[in-house]
Amino acid sequence: ATCSAVQLSPCLAAITKNTPPSAACCNKLKEQKPCLCGYLKDPNLKNYVNSPGARKTASSCGVALKC
């Protein structure tokens, strides 16, 4: 998978509005999993990826954020 945070756009509502993640969101999150640690190092993305909403979304999708 190419690392592109835009790919995670289906997760935006789940992350920002605290709604359950869609199947599309979980699929993209799993695809982008190898990229998540890189996003955490990016000052523009860090606040989104490390937010409680993002962590909850990842957890709901069964994706562990371990960097």
From Swiss-Prot:
Swiss-Prot/TrEMBL GO biological process terms: lipid transport
PTM description: Disulfide bonds.
Chain segments annotated as coiled-coil in the UniProt record: none
pH-activity profile: Stable at pH 3.
Keywords for the protein's UniProt record, in alphabetical order: Allergen, Disulfide bond, Lipid-binding, Transport
CDD domains per record: nsLTP2
Keyword Ribosomal protein: no
Gene3D superfamilies, alphabetized: Plant lipid-transfer and hydrophobic proteins (1.10.110.10)
Thermal activity profile: Stable up to 90 degrees Celsius.
GO MF terms, alphabetically ordered: lipid binding
Keyword Transport: yes
Disulfide cysteine pairs (residue numbers): C3-C35, C11-C25, C26-C61, C37-C67
Similarity comment: family membership: Belongs to the plant LTP family.
Note: Found in celeriac but not in celery. Highly resistant to pepsin and other proteinases.
Function as written in the Swiss-Prot or TrEMBL entry: Plant non-specific lipid-transfer proteins transfer phospholipids as well as galactolipids across membranes. May play a role in wax or cutin deposition in the cell walls of expanding epidermal cells and certain secretory tissues.
Subunit structure: Monomer.
The protein, known as: Non-specific lipid-transfer protein 2
